[in-house]
Amino acid sequence: PNGFKIYWAEKGVMIATGGFSANEEMRTMYMGPWAANLKIRGSLRNTGENIMMTRPLGAKLVNMTEFYAGPIVPETHANPARVSNSAYGMIVGKDGKRCVDESLGQAMRSKLLPQVTPDNRTFIICDIKTNDEDNILTKLLDRFKRLNSPVYEANTIEELADKAGINKANLVNSVKEFNKVISEGKGPSLVPPHNRKKAHPVATAPFYAIPMSGGIAATFGGPKINKHAQVVDVDDKPIPGLYAAGN
């Protein structure tokens, strides 16, 4: 309220302010337009201003495209990973079409979701048999209920599509194709492929649609440092008095 304070550093400045996961402009600049749709899983304060302040000093910025990703429901911060990382279910966009290989690890899968959908809004479509894996569906439903995070349930795929706002015709066709190909043991032939070694059909009511988006937890880029934690310039020479630590 009383204006800026100016501090004069006698021996140097240490930057330890985290990354830029919450800065949409920087994500777009360094990762691409799709990254604007990533949902925040980590701190809203990781906005990267101090990283950008090193640019006029000639700092070499490295690893600016790298980050850790994971699934999230952005409105409630519920985490659907327990089911999305299981051997059950398929992942579709709001158009009702499968959009990613479900066998991918959660970080890679979450990075792809905003690239293969227009709005980074998807659903895990699964059935009650998902509980065969350590009762994971019931555990997720209990947690989502505590967080007031919606999960849609129905006795038919058609009804499920209506409840979740998914394209009905496409979802019905996607589930039929998925079940047929999985039953034949030809999951890798799907587009996109399904490479789970023990794949399961979505065939036993009740059926569930669990919202999921790709989220960003932390970025890994920033000013490059040497073994003395000195920030270096584009020629890898130390910038006097400037140090950095962290991601």
Question: Over which residues does each language-model region extend?
Answer:
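Glycine-rich loop(s) and the adjacent beta-strand/alpha-helix scaffold that form part
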Residues: 3-72, 78
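Short Gly/Pro-enriched turn/cap motifs at secondary-structure boundaries
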Residues: 41-44, 79-82, 103, 114, ...
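A glycine-rich dinucleotide-binding beta-alpha-beta segment and adjacent secondary-structure elements
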Residues: 170-246
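Generic beta-strand/beta-sheet core signal
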Residues: 10, 16-17, 62-64, 93-94, ...
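Short coil/turn connectors at secondary-structure junctions
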Residues: 8-11, 86-87, 118-121, 237-240
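Short, glycine-/Ser/Thr-/acidic-enriched flexible segments
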Residues: 2-5, 12, 19-21, 45, ...
